[in-house]
From Swiss-Prot:
Chief subcellular location: plastid
Name of protein: Large ribosomal subunit protein uL2cz/uL2cy
GO BP field: mitochondrial translation
Sequence segments annotated as region (Disordered): 225-274
UniProt keyword terms in alphabetical order: Chloroplast, Plastid, Ribonucleoprotein, Ribosomal protein
Subunit field text: Part of the 50S ribosomal subunit.
Pfam families to which the protein is assigned, alphabetical: Ribosomal_L2, Ribosomal_L2_C
Keyword Signal: no
Database matches in InterPro entries: NA-bd_OB-fold, Rib_uL2_dom2, Ribosomal_uL2, Ribosomal_uL2_bac/org-type, Ribosomal_uL2_C, Ribosomal_uL2_CS, Ribosomal_uL2_dom3, Ribosomal_uL2_RNA-bd_dom
Provenance organism: Crucihimalaya wallichii (Rock-cress)
Keyword Ribonucleoprotein among UniProt keywords: yes
One of the record's GO cellular component terms: mitochondrial large ribosomal subunit
HAMAP family in UniProt: Ribosomal_uL2_B (MF_01320_B)
Source taxon at top rank: Eukaryota
Amino acid sequence: MAIHLYKTSTPSTRNGAVASQVKSNPRNNLIYGQHHCGKGRNARGIITARHRGGGHKRLYRKIDFRRNAKDIYGRIVTIEYDPNRNAYICLIHYGDGEKRYILHPRGAIIGDTIVSGTEVPIKMGNALPLTDMPLGTAIHNIEITLGKGGQLARAAGAVAKLIAKEGKSATLKLPSGEVRLISKNCSATVGQVGNVGVNQKSLGRAGSKCWLGKRPVVRGVVMNPVDHPHGGGEGRAPIGRKKPVTPWGYPALGRRTRKRKKYSETLILRRRSK
């Protein structure tokens, strides 16, 4: 992905760094509309997720995370922009006439062929079970539950690594640094997710953030006491506490938020690095 810098004629162009445009002309049978009823609010209209609202209308693209078209070769026809994720997507034409969207693997170009199955080549974009992959393989779109479809390493530039296989489980190192066990029968896609340079983008202005459906974020220390525990005081005042807290009074910045006694506690060998 190419990053474009513009002539500094306005503050937004001075601070902005935008990605090269990828056209999107989605197929009608692979999209459907989404009904957003009060973004960030529950059925009573109460804000349950702050800093959400507005944004441009989107059509959801149906992505094939399962990759269950076994032993049928497909060809990459287009590489398109998807407003619902930061990775690009590819339109695949399979040999039996079916058409599906998949995540764009890094380095894949129009005209490349892909396939999924049990005895397929270890090639970028191919999907196969972990038991058939050699150690050290870079993978993405990884299943946690057999047949449910890929759930891990799906963001732009994400890549995991297969580091061990023992018994019925395979050991993976995830993009977050977490090391965990997954069934060897689960499938994954070879390679890294494309659009690696997405973190180099700079929106440059507040309006671009609003187009994404994200509202402004206000610090608690500049609020009133009725709005935040950090608020109040004369002029620029400290938070008045030993440690920072959330707007609801719970400890913030360092408190572990993972639920205790989850089923996957025994599957995680090393916590993610911060």
